[in-house]
């Protein structure tokens, strides 16, 4: 019997996408934060953007094979801003400011239609609810959930930036399961990527998995084994609330 439903954040509870406007705004955001802290890079915008993007690629090359998440000062001080002579100690005072800004600026984010109605329906069934999210910011997910007006629906919010583990690593799921005090077999997981949100819960023995497409799905779901299938595929997240889970 399913008594707990856990959700991915970006691409699942919210629509998320990147375009030229958001790419430009996020680079400008980095420059603005650095200048506010007395650091002027004295470099043209295009070269700055190339260096920052190369830094993110370096971090991705470290992070993805290990399924690990570093803290903001490590990400920005040891990967993203190293071309500018900055390091963990120098960026530590404003690393989370950079991380938070990047998450809400590099990505356009809007709450998916029918999320509140779906959460209300699950609450009405007595379900425990939680979020498990890969994120490079310590606080952004909490703040955005509050901005959407849905923070209070969730008994737990587990983040890779806090645990140090990224989906599909089993440890991030285990942290959430301990927080909500549920067994894997009694949990359903809802996400937009097979490579993280379906493979991870299947390996953990979750009772059900839901998959919903997003902008990120094709970007992240490369080289996924053909036999990896969710229990349910949905087009409208509201379907989670009326699928027969019990």
Task: Label every model-predicted segment.
Residues 232-236:
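Short acidic-hydrophobic, aromatic-tinged amphipathic segments that line or gate anion-handling sites
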Residues 188-229:
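Acidic, Mg2+-coordinating phosphoryl-transfer loop and its flanking beta/alpha structural elements
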Residues 45-99:
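A metal-dependent, Asp-based hydrolase signature
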Residues 123-130, 135-158:
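Substrate-recognition/cap helix-loop segment adjacent to the acidic, metal-dependent catalytic center
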Residues 166-198:
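Conserved Lys-Pro-Asp/Glu-containing loop-to-beta segment of HAD-superfamily phosphomonoesterases
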Residues 243-246:
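Conserved small/polar residues in nucleotide/adenosyl-binding loops
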Residues 1-49:
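Active-site neighborhood of HAD-like aspartate-dependent phosphohydrolases
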Residues 67-74, 92-93, 100-129:
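Short, acidic loop-to-helix structural element flanking the phosphoryl-transfer center
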């Amino acid at each position: 019997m399913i008594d707990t439903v856990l959700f991915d954040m970006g691409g699942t509870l919210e629509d998320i996408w990147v375009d030229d406007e958001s790419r430009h705004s996020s680079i400008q955001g980095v420059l603005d934060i650095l200048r506010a802290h007395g650091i002027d890079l004295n470099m043209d915008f295009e070269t700055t953007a190339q260096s920052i993007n190369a830094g993110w690629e370096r971090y991705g090359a470290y992070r993805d094979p290990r399924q690990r998440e570093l803290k903001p000062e490590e990400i920005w001080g040891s990967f993203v801003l190293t071309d500018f002579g900055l390091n963990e100690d120098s960026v530590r005072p404003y690393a989370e400011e950079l991380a938070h800004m990047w998450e809400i600026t590099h990505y356009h984010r809007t709450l998916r239609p029918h999320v509140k109605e779906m959460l209300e329906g699950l609450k009405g069934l007595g379900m425990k609810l939680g979020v498990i999210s890969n994120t490079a910011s310590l606080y952004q997910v909490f703040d955005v959930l509050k901005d959407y007006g849905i923070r209070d629906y969730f008994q737990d919010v587990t983040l890779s930036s806090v645990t140090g583990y990224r989906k599909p690593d089993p440890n991030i799921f285990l942290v959430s399961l301990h927080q909500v005090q549920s067994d894997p077999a009694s949990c359903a997981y809802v996400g937009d990527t097979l490579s993280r949100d379906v493979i991870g819960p299947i390996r953990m023995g979750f009772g059900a998995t839901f998959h919903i497409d997003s902008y990120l799905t094709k970007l992240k779901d490369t080289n996924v084994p053909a036999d990896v299938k969710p229990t349910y595929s949905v087009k409208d997240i509201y379907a989670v609330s009326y699928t027969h889970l019990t």
